[in-house]
Amino acid sequence: MKLVLFLNMGGATNLQDCEVFLKNMFNDPYILGIKNRFLRKFVAWIITKARVKAMQENYKKMGGKSPLNELTQSLCDKLNLKQDEFKFDFVNLYVPPFATEILQKYTLNASDEIILFPLYPHHSCTTVTSSLEVLQNEISKQKIQAKVKTIDIFYKNELYNEMIVSHILAKKSKFDAKILIFSAHSLPQSIIDKGDLYEKHVNDHVEILKEKLKDHFDEFILAYQSKLGPVKWLEPNTSDVLANLNDKALIYPISFCIDCSETIFELGMEYKHLSKYNYDLISCPNDSDEFMEFILKYLSDLN
């Protein structure tokens, strides 16, 4: 068996899971860099209690749940129907399904392979490193003897970028805008200053896409969303960019592979009132045929 596990932070599937998500996220040492585990747990509890009601209110506007789990499950189901070389499943970091329960579903031996596939095109310790570490620790804990392969970044992949360009131009054919905003999830500047490669990878990716799209847009803007708290984060903020738009625009959520609250609610709903001009949101790759084609080709090349 070649078991491919997509890794992601996950999205709450009900309002009660909002607290679970926040608690686990802020207990992650890669997210909240407090070395003392007990102090980190206490601070995480305070942050969770302060934020959970607002998060639940936001989720109510999306129908009470994030679309991330359903879309990822659909992606796995479609891939499993499409071929029989790989078995696809997914693991979340902060809400179910967790690594423990997913790995226990399968009987794996030394002749099998586990391919860990974080659904993040750019590397960051807060996403890729954290996810891989949790999975590798659980594999070791369960004494699974299968060979483990890991996939890191894929933002330079030609097929992946052709897919993005195709999705952007398809949306542009219905909503003709001359400005394209690439919105990436922000990170605290302190994490970047410690050597995290995320900002560099995002900048590199934007340059690749700008070159491919230069004949279709007059202006490209990279902005960062989802800032939390008073510390310095990567800039400019997507909300500020939208507030200062001088024409209609398209937004592509460049750091996301699957639509989630940050895309559907934050970009699609919360920021709508900020701009004097209309903007339209381009969907993430999700469970599209083009994304499946990229995944299967990437895995084939890996082997």
Curated annotation (Swiss-Prot):
Enzymatic class: lyase
Pathway in which the depicted protein is active: Porphyrin-containing compound metabolism; protoheme biosynthesis; protoheme from protoporphyrin-IX: step 1/1
Described function: Catalyzes the ferrous insertion into protoporphyrin IX.
Known catalytic reactions: heme b + 2 H(+) = protoporphyrin IX + Fe(2+)
Listed name of the protein: Ferrochelatase
Alphabetical keyword list: Cytoplasm, Heme biosynthesis, Iron, Lyase, Metal-binding, Porphyrin biosynthesis
Pfam families: Ferrochelatase
This enzyme's EC code(s): 4.98.1.1
